[in-house]
Amino acid sequence: MPSVSRAVCVQRASGNNGRRCRDGAAAAGRRSVVAQRARHGKPEVAIRSGSGGSARGGHCSPLRAVAAPIPTTKKRVFHFGKGKSEGNKAMKDLLGGKGANLAEMASIGLSVPPGFTVSTEACQQYQAAGKTLPAGLWEEIVEGLQWVEEYMAARLGDPARPLLLSVRSGAAVSMPGMMDTVLNLGLNDEVAAGLAAKSGDRFAYDSYRRFLDMFGNVVMDIPHALFEEKLEAMKAVKGLHNDTDLTATDLKELVAQYKDVYVEAKGEPFPSDPKKQLQLAVLAVFNSWDSPRAIKYRSINKITGLKGTAVNVQTMVFGNMGNTSGTGVLFTRNPSTGEKKLYGEFLVNAQGEDVVAGIRTPEDLDAMRDHMPEPYEELVENCKILESHYKEMMDIEFTVQENRLWMLQCRTGKRTGKGAVKIAVDMVNEGLVERRTALKMVEPGHLDQLLHPQFENPSGYKDKVIATGLPASPGAAVGQIVFTAEDAEAWHAQGKDVILVRTETSPEDVGGMHAAVGILTARGGMTSHAAVVARGWGKCCVSGCSSVRVNDASKIVVIEDKALHEGEWLSLNGSTGEVIIGKQPLCPPALSGDLETFMSWVDEVRKLKVMANADTPEDATTARQNGAEGIGLCRTEHMFFASDERIKAVRQMIMASSLELRQKALDRLLPYQRSDFEGIFRAMDGLPVTIRLLDPPLHEFLPEGHVEDMVRELCSETGAAQDDVLARVEKLSEVNPMLGFRGCRLGISYPELTEMQARAIFEAAITMTNQGIQVFPEIMVPLVGTPQELGHQVDVIRQIANKVFTDMGKTIGYKVGTMIEIPRAALVADEIAEQAEFFSFGTNDLTQMTFGYSRDDVGKFLPIYLSQGILQHDPFEVLDQRGVGELVKLATERGRKARPNLKVGICGEHGGEPLSVAFFAKAGLDYVSCSPFRVPIARLAAAQVLL
């Protein structure tokens, strides 16, 4: 049994490389805390923060109390322990997810080490006060500390009765690895000596050197590599391979060397006063909120509206006190597959960061059952309690100290798309949740993952498998090797697919991880930083591949006996852990029966229809398979590029010097267009198909290259004289083509162009109708800015319709409408609705023209705008609700005043973006239209807005 001084330090956590931190929290378990204390002595305290930000930049300036804004909530420090807490799981906004769940676990009687949480509002006040602690906060923190000291009968800084703390962050939204944990806070020379007298030299000085490393890196911003160099040098001198082989004498020497690092790196000694350590750690947590990696993580995941991070200060328990101690991470169900079975990893005689950072290779959770049967049984029971209580799949961190189980953290577990759908369906079938609740358990992005490709023939590449690691995040990825996050982002910006190869990842790598199609790491388990982040994003990831040796400096990775350089192709199977040399072919994934069940529940709830943007029969078929209720945008110009003959006919039409020559070229195009429309009508039998007339500027159909080459090619294709072709090309040249001769302006200038397209549509529709296909054509006129423009095109279309109906002896129903993509059209929507039977918002161009941003040039300044908070989102990805959204609402209202039965939808890129879909549903639109593969995402988003 440990003596009182053996700190009950729950060391669960992210260490130096931005790893996910794990720590202990405060609450007595089903066994009373009093009994625990009697048996196991007094735990030490652990401090954690509750945010998702990086923990850089605490620095050494002392805390200064200054006047601060009046807090929204007067109480800013909330303690937990003794089987009851001052907070609960509903207080995530105030306590952060970590703090709220620690309080909840303590309240329901689980074994949680005691501690306190500093609220997110305190962080908000700190930021508002120019990064100065608000008045009175430090005194409140000291009171919280005294409460813990009194309960534990131990004191921070007391060598005889040492209390050690862990400090971590925890915002309302989980952001793995964004803030590193500080463990063993409170150690100095005197406390370490006192701890050694009661718990042994090796344990005390191993804890001390770990604390010096973590505190220096996380709080003082000293590079972890400086400490790592000292450690590796000592092991080399001693001829040792593992950290655990170092003796107590070695560790004492290492402590002295680590303290020298502080002087060398910062010009000042390590702060030995434990309360000063606590002050600086709290500052580091608060400062982590707006660190570059925290900002990037929130930007990537579109996380906005949070107050800040909480700080969790908690009594520590130790998993590194011998073979009856250990630490682990688990999910109550398999996060990759959704299988109802505990899934996790465990390490005997280890601290939490050893699991998540890949410092040691962990064992499967089943190994714990053999090593520690009693704590394992209690853990299994706790998992059942938590899953039943939260009605969710949970991510749990725990430590066993000398056969005593401590629950350190629980939160809703991140999962893959496949796992999310299965868990939701299974929990409904188990009677644990209602269907509507299950719909909220799956994110739209999860469905995106399910639609990612898999390998075409897994058995065909077996001879090319060069290594096998852990299957950390499922799916398949094929890309070119890069070794840094910066290179991954740069190559991705050039349109290249890349595989990010690292020894291990850290939160600094999140930008590159997001840019990569797949991630391969040499170290780290199934719950490492790389694995957790990759699963959350649906990225293929193979981790813990021990045969991988990365040389970042030379940009070479050696796998077994093969040396691969930057830019070489590599394939990853995240479902099996296989690393395959070369570029393996991919195919679309097969969708599960669980997804079909889940999507049927989605469709029972949603009211907004979901259509698809599809230009070919193949696209239309895919869209229908994914649940599209019609085609909301069929772009006719894409059909012109389908063959050389077609594009030559288009160019002849463009180069035509007379109506006769132009009509001749259009007559050649007519059968091509008619055939394409027949295929699409056939694929969408019984569903509406909205066909947009020609929209792009004519110059887009001309050959690329130098003018001389272009003229030579056009002369060859059209037989026209060189001077005539050159004059025509110069006439087509425009200063700003996106605002130039395009859309309905083409159809008005060349009515025969609209006539040809309308004839192709109506002839195809009647032909299909005669074959028993139900056809509902809708013709959409693009780039309308005045009712007169639309009126002109409507007249042309209806005249052709009547001619075709007469010639073919059959009449069919059809609609004529317009795209609303010019701000003026939105403002005069009531007048336009007199001619239009439907509106479809082209939000791509509407965004361009409303902001005055060119999509082709926005990349020059948009990253700056996003990083400085001038814009919260890329407006071409997420609809600008305040500006563009207001035009959408205004046009819808005015249009329906003039035509009450006006059908209104949207066909821009925003049609598949969840936040935008939710807005369109609330705005009263009838449908959204998006790419075929985003149809399930839009369906779910349309349902979730009603929950």
UniProtKB/Swiss-Prot annotation:
<feature type="binding site">
    <location>
        <position position="692"/>
    </location>
    <ligand>
        <name>substrate</name>
    </ligand>
</feature>
<dbReference type="InterPro" id="IPR010121">
    <property type="entry name" value="Pyruvate_phosphate_dikinase"/>
</dbReference>
<comment type="function">
    <text>Formation of phosphoenolpyruvate. The cytoplasmic isoform supports the biosynthetic processes in the nascent endosperm and provides an efficient mechanism for glycolytic ATP synthesis in oxygen depleted tissues. May be involved in regulating the flux of carbon into starch and fatty acids of seeds and in the remobilization of nitrogen reserves in senescing leaves.</text>
</comment>
<feature type="binding site">
    <location>
        <position position="842"/>
    </location>
    <ligand>
        <name>substrate</name>
    </ligand>
</feature>
<feature type="binding site">
    <location>
        <position position="844"/>
    </location>
    <ligand>
        <name>substrate</name>
    </ligand>
</feature>
<dbReference type="GO" id="GO:0016301">
    <property type="term" value="F:kinase activity"/>
</dbReference>
<feature type="binding site">
    <location>
        <position position="843"/>
    </location>
    <ligand>
        <name>substrate</name>
    </ligand>
</feature>
<dbReference type="GO" id="GO:0015979">
    <property type="term" value="P:photosynthesis"/>
</dbReference>
<dbReference type="InterPro" id="IPR008279">
    <property type="entry name" value="PEP-util_enz_mobile_dom"/>
</dbReference>
<dbReference type="InterPro" id="IPR018274">
    <property type="entry name" value="PEP_util_AS"/>
</dbReference>
<feature type="modified residue" description="Phosphothreonine; by PDRP1">
    <location>
        <position position="527"/>
    </location>
</feature>
<comment type="subunit">
    <text>Homotetramer.</text>
</comment>
<feature type="active site" description="Tele-phosphohistidine intermediate">
    <location>
        <position position="529"/>
    </location>
</feature>
<feature type="binding site">
    <location>
        <position position="845"/>
    </location>
    <ligand>
        <name>Mg(2+)</name>
    </ligand>
</feature>
<keyword id="KW-0547">Nucleotide-binding</keyword>
<dbReference type="InterPro" id="IPR015813">
    <property type="entry name" value="Pyrv/PenolPyrv_kinase-like_dom"/>
</dbReference>
<feature type="binding site">
    <location>
        <position position="845"/>
    </location>
    <ligand>
        <name>substrate</name>
    </ligand>
</feature>
<dbReference type="GO" id="GO:0050242">
    <property type="term" value="F:pyruvate, phosphate dikinase activity"/>
</dbReference>
<dbReference type="GO" id="GO:0046872">
    <property type="term" value="F:metal ion binding"/>
</dbReference>
<dbReference type="GO" id="GO:0009507">
    <property type="term" value="C:chloroplast"/>
</dbReference>
<dbReference type="GO" id="GO:0005524">
    <property type="term" value="F:ATP binding"/>
</dbReference>
<feature type="binding site">
    <location>
        <position position="821"/>
    </location>
    <ligand>
        <name>Mg(2+)</name>
    </ligand>
</feature>
<keyword id="KW-0670">Pyruvate</keyword>
<keyword id="KW-0934">Plastid</keyword>
<keyword id="KW-0809">Transit peptide</keyword>
<keyword id="KW-0460">Magnesium</keyword>
<dbReference type="InterPro" id="IPR023151">
    <property type="entry name" value="PEP_util_CS"/>
</dbReference>
<keyword id="KW-0597">Phosphoprotein</keyword>
<dbReference type="InterPro" id="IPR002192">
    <property type="entry name" value="PPDK_AMP/ATP-bd"/>
</dbReference>
<keyword id="KW-0479">Metal-binding</keyword>
<keyword id="KW-0808">Transferase</keyword>
<feature type="binding site">
    <location>
        <position position="821"/>
    </location>
    <ligand>
        <name>substrate</name>
    </ligand>
</feature>
<dbReference type="GO" id="GO:0005829">
    <property type="term" value="C:cytosol"/>
</dbReference>
<feature type="binding site">
    <location>
        <position position="635"/>
    </location>
    <ligand>
        <name>substrate</name>
    </ligand>
</feature>
<dbReference type="Pfam" id="PF02896">
    <property type="entry name" value="PEP-utilizers_C"/>
</dbReference>
<dbReference type="Pfam" id="PF00391">
    <property type="entry name" value="PEP-utilizers"/>
</dbReference>
<keyword id="KW-0963">Cytoplasm</keyword>
<keyword id="KW-0418">Kinase</keyword>
<dbReference type="InterPro" id="IPR000121">
    <property type="entry name" value="PEP_util_C"/>
</dbReference>
<keyword id="KW-0067">ATP-binding</keyword>
<feature type="active site" description="Proton donor">
    <location>
        <position position="907"/>
    </location>
</feature>
<feature type="transit peptide" description="Chloroplast">
    <location>
        <begin position="1"/>
        <end position="71"/>
    </location>
</feature>
